[in-house]
Amino acid sequence: MQPVFYKYTSTKEYHDAFPCAYRQWRADSHCNLIHGYSFSMKFYFGTNDLDVRNWAADYGGLKELKKTLEDQFDHTLIVAQDDPQMETFKLLQERNMAKIVVLPKLGCEGLSDMLYKYVNGVYIPEMWGPGEAARLWCYRVEVRETQANMAFREGHREWNEDLFA
């Protein structure tokens, strides 16, 4: 895949904005225990053409994205959909001890991939419309656990990826 460069880039960052807990149940280390972070997330929007306001991306138009992120990550216990302890986690939720969010992949890599696909495949087309979806691409999504640990998902429309796979 060839790198793609955009003439303009705008970023939106949510710094230490989403306190949540999860575990990597497949890990051989202490990461298989429930532990928490206050996630930071950063979105890179690229375009070669500014809109009529001379903007790459409309920051005010990201309010619904922030709400979606809060619903998924703010004071939640994120559980992998194949976690063998799923019934235990469900019991915690039934007893009002946790707000469970079940996701297909965890870790910064999995979360950044999920968010990359959501922003490009759902959010921009549905919230901003097909014209903006044709003009603008969120080409990088970073998910940060701590100052030392971050992973990102990068891609470009020109790569013709299936965003729903």
Q: Regions from the language model: what does each represent?
A:
Residues M1-A165:
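Charge-rich, low-complexity N-terminal segments
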